[in-house]
Amino acid sequence: MERMGLNEIREEYLKFFESKAHLRLPSFSLVPKNDKSLLLINAGMAPLKPYFTGLQVPPNKRVTTCQKCVRTGDIENVGKTSRHGTFFEMMGNFSFGDYFKEEVIPWAWEFTTEVLKLPKNKLYVTIYEDDDEALDIWVNKTDVDPKRIFRLGKEDNFWEHGLGPCGPCSEIHFNRGAGEVKTSEEFVKASDEDKIVEFWNLVFTQFDKDEEGNYNKLANPNIDTGMGLERMATIMQNVDTIFEVDTIKAVLDKVCKLSGANYKEDRVKDISIRIITDHIRSITFMISDGILPSNEGRGYVLRRLLRRAARHGKTLGINNTFLHNLTDIVIENCYKNYPELEEKREYIKKIIKLEEERFDETIDAGMQILNDYIKEVKNNNYKVLSGDKAFKLYDTYGFPVELTEEILEEEGISIDKEGFNKEMKEQRERARSAREETNYMGAEDTILNKIDLNINTDFEGYDKLEVKSKVAVIIKDEEFKNEIEKGNEGVIVTYNTPFYAEMGGQIGDTGIIYNDNFKAEVIDCKKNISGKILHFVKILDGKVALEDQVILKVNEGRRNNIRKNHTATHILHAALIKVVGDHVQQSGSYVDDERLRFDFSHFEAVSEDELKEVEKIVNKEIMKANAVNTKVMNIEEAKQQGAIALFDNKYKDDVRVVSVGDFSKELCGGTHVSNSGQIGMFKVVSEAGVAAGIRRIEAVTAFKAMEYVDHKNNILKEAAQILKCNEKELLNKLNHQVLEMKEKEKEIEALKLKLASGAEDEILNNIKEIKGVKVASAAVKDIDGNALRDLGDKIRDNMQSGVVVLGSNYKGKVLFVAMATKDTVAKGVHCGKIIKEVASIAGGGGGGRPDMAQAGGKDPNKLEDAIKTVETVVESLVK
């Protein structure tokens, strides 16, 4: 057995299966496509589900991949053990109804013993206990020692996930120090102790489990195998953990260099070193696939990983931002197999650094909150911090509960761990229930996805708006039909069509389908999971049957408007890169016949000056009337020419490149104008943030842009008429009016204060005494919170001893304030409790200290009733 580097193992594996007529596919994105069952790709076969289910035709019946994966289910163990990690690569070879056990078992043995040259006396094989077929192949088609084959039960060697495709599996294991193992019991014990490790799982998907629990044989069984690259590397490099594998150790060494810590000298520091080493790999790959830090979904996973790693950097004494610098080491060791990392290097580093800087701000804010909690606990003579507060620090400020515990321990305070765990459990349940229910294989179980894969629709809509074709499929009421008639709605699929199906942010076409005997309105056009073009129709007249000849005609005016908006989106993208910066990446778009919407990565609002410049550049390119050209070329050639590709798109070898003069060049399958002049005009309507690090621009073109400008002009004219001036004088007139209003408001506030002062005497004249405590309470109209507090201060100071509770109805809201002198607090008065009871009458709430509290209410009509309860509440508190 010769030592092999991780990258070398990957290449040898893929080359081996290419030699067995497999198509090598690049790794799919970590962002699942058309699979709502997953947040992130977490297994080698996950992106291939549509091929296994028959929903899509695979590019080849034999495929091999090395798939990047992220799993965070056991993130708490990462770092604490030397084998857990969030990022890993899974190598696999797959058969979609082609070869089966008789081929894959000998191939697996050949690669293991002849390519990797693992010693046969250190290898073991396990099979499902009832799989005699697999046993026979292992014994007769390989030279494995039969004594080294063990039959295990369903728990170990049968792959199933609920209902649907499933089957037995066979695994290959390596002995890492268990001595000679002779029985299955000894084997299981050694495996549990990690002395024998499984490194390759061959799944024989040959059954379909139904709701009755029956295992029905599949007509075309599949092969799905998985070999963890990092685990294989530990064997080939004779190291104990994934953190000692060559490419990963390079990252670990850099962490040690930055922190000044030595690995394997301090158990606590080792945990932090491993966490940072693992997490930066996941972080780098996730951002390269277009995921950005946020508070939900995939973005939340990324933020959690990034902040956890950053916090452990502080634990190691790294006080500056540092994670972005580790990215270079990850990329250097991976870019040959993942070229997108090199292409997006600077972008990845910028995202990481910005999030690190945000966390620095957050952790400081979190410390302030924690210090406030500590004071509150001590003031109330408690010894425990409530679980919900500890969870708030964890969830909102990124404070690991261990860090909170450590700080509290120094203050002699503990955490309500049960309450914290309850909050954590509820959050996980919320996250789990929020995920859309779907079958395991990831595709919605709808008739639209069950259309025969052999039926294909040729799209001819780039240069035609009307074509003749035949009806291939009719769907009505979730059933395949032979015909559909007037008054019904359904779906029609034809063999060719000019209708563009919604894709890439561009809305689907509308129009009509007709012949001499029928007419249907096409109200939408979409694709199913296998790419079939679906015309959603309403039958207006007559009826149509399968194989009928029809004419399909797109609504030309609507299509033209969509074209204008789509081409304008491309020009906008290029203009944003030019003005805002080359970190701008498209993260989403929407194009219809009314407007366009463009989402892009940027970390602050686009300034007014920048927006004006972007708008100016777009209109300048429109006025140039640049030719818009489309060309199909190889993906690599397109990238070399500078064509912009989107993060989450998986492109074929040949791609369609859309160029607008020399200004814009993008990979795109949508419809466009033939020259930019046809767009006419471009106008930005709005710019706003839609998520952390994501901005959105909405805009209109052509006549819609003119309508927008006309609307704005009309508003200006109406405003000028109201202010009785011309449009040139409008700004000066408005400024004058605003200043005048502010002066009037000051006068009004001064009058209110005078009224409040007058109310002071009346309130002091109506003081009540309850159990020896003076109580002043009243409802005062139309004064704000500051004035209400000032009035309360004056009354309390005049009373010298007593309680003051005031309420006010101000601008439709209810305000309350309560104040008490120290001697009344000693008698049991607590303003926080008083204000809570009183405000609840007016539909509000609040609280505060024993000597001062304030609150709000929602129902002004209940103000008087609320104030009437003051005396009763005070009476209940006074000792």
Swiss-Prot record:
Cofactor binding comment, as recorded: Binds 1 zinc ion per subunit.
Cellular localization per UniProt: Cytoplasm
Main location: cytoplasm
Domain of life the protein comes from: Bacteria
Regions annotated as coiled coil: none
MF terms (GO), sorted A to Z: alanine-tRNA ligase activity; aminoacyl-tRNA deacylase activity; ATP binding; catalytic activity, acting on a protein; transferase activity; tRNA binding; zinc ion binding
Binding site for Zn(2+): 566, 570, 668, 672
GO CC field: cytosol
Parts of the chain that traverse the membrane: none
CDD domains per UniProt: AlaRS_core
Keyword RNA-binding: yes
Cofactor annotation: Zn(2+)
EC number: 6.1.1.7
Reactions this protein catalyses: tRNA(Ala) + L-alanine + ATP = L-alanyl-tRNA(Ala) + AMP + diphosphate
Keywords of the record: Aminoacyl-tRNA synthetase, ATP-binding, Cytoplasm, Ligase, Metal-binding, Nucleotide-binding, Protein biosynthesis, RNA-binding, tRNA-binding, Zinc
Record-linked PROSITE patterns: AA_TRNA_LIGASE_II_ALA
GO biological process, one term: alanyl-tRNA aminoacylation
First-tier enzyme category under EC: ligase
Repeat as UniProt keyword: no
UniProt function note: Catalyzes the attachment of alanine to tRNA(Ala) in a two-step reaction: alanine is first activated by ATP to form Ala-AMP and then transferred to the acceptor end of tRNA(Ala). Also edits incorrectly charged Ser-tRNA(Ala) and Gly-tRNA(Ala) via its editing domain.
Domain notes: Consists of three domains; the N-terminal catalytic domain, the editing domain and the C-terminal C-Ala domain. The editing domain removes incorrectly charged amino acids, while the C-Ala domain, along with tRNA(Ala), serves as a bridge to cooperatively bring together the editing and aminoacylation centers thus stimulating deacylation of misacylated tRNAs.
Family: Belongs to the class-II aminoacyl-tRNA synthetase family.
Protein name, per record: Alanine--tRNA ligase
Species, as recorded: Clostridium botulinum (strain Loch Maree / Type A3)
Gene that encodes it: alaS
